[in-house]
Amino acid sequence: MNASESLNAANECHDDDPVRGAALLRGIDAAALKADDWPLYAFLLNHVLIEKLGLPAEANERQHRLLAVAGETPAPVLLRHAAVSALLAGDSVAELAHAAEFGAATSVSTAQAVELVQLAAAALRVPGLGATAAGRLALDALAPLAAAHWQQTSALDTAAAAQCNNIAGSLAERPLADLADATLREAVERTADWSQVFWQRAGTWVNHERACYLRALVAGALGEAEAARAHARTGLALLDSHDSAQEQSVDRAFLELEQAYACERLGRAEEAAAAHARADALAADFNDAGLTAWYRQRVERNRLLKG
């Protein structure tokens, strides 16, 4: 395989087999990649080597090599990934240098860039921590978002939305016992809220609809059925308004599923059955093994949450 093929192979297998994904990444010479491949390569270095395997020093070394290949003006996304790996590797000098460059490249202060880097680093660390520690880390990373400079549109909004989305999704999928932890519960709700705030500023209607799905999923995980139903219905209303071509039928299936689950918990049996039937009909047309497996996982997860 050439470098791009190895990268694609790593991207396909890393969740199911992170060791193989890491081996593929290690075999890639960054100089042999096309510039268009660099963002995915940088993302996978941190996601696989740090989040999956706990190897921040190696990720940091490889991020530095990538920046050397990228030249004098690396894309902001490369600087962000490099700053995150430096932070988690304990390389404070490189962290601050990359964060300063990242801030300059995105027209924000170094302080705000550092806050985004810390949020992204938290997203990598949260999955490996216990419930209370994960919740506390997430809340600490969210705290700077209350500052005035985060209340206006900036070039960091999309990245902040994505990082909050990642943290909320990870926390919502924790073992059921973890969902009883007060710190984690506060963290998952607040990260989902912040994700929606940023997507409303920076995203398209599809991002807005998916933020509603995340809010529904989180509310369901927390046992807040009324809120879950309301968020799911808001997302479905956005689809009704914008998706006449039915290009987002996968999104609709998962929103209907969350609506069905919420209605079951609320005792709305007929409404639940109708929503579940619509979800199942849409899922039957996925023609994608991964999506079908994900749908079945959500069905089982909702069954467990319902108790």
Task: Walk through the language-model features, giving the residues of each.
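Structural signature of alpha-solenoid helical repeat junctions
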Residues: D37-W38, P74-L78, A111-A113, Q152-Q163, ...
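C-terminal non-catalytic interaction modules
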Residues: A9, Q259-G307
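Residues in the short coil linking paired helices within alpha-helical repeat scaffolds
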Residues: D17, G54-L55, D91-S92, P127-A134, ...
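Structural motif corresponding to the intra-repeat A-B loop/turn of tetratricopeptide repeats
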Residues: K52-L53, A89-G90, R174, A182, ...
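Amphipathic alpha-helical segments of tetratricopeptide repeats
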Residues: R26-A30, H64-G71, A100-V108, L139-Q152, ...
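Residue at a conserved register position within TPR or TPR-like alpha-solenoid repeats
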Residues: C13, L49-I50, A86-L87, A123, ...
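Amphipathic alpha-helical repeat scaffolds of TPR domains
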Residues: S4-L7, D36-H47, P74-H81, T110-L129, ...
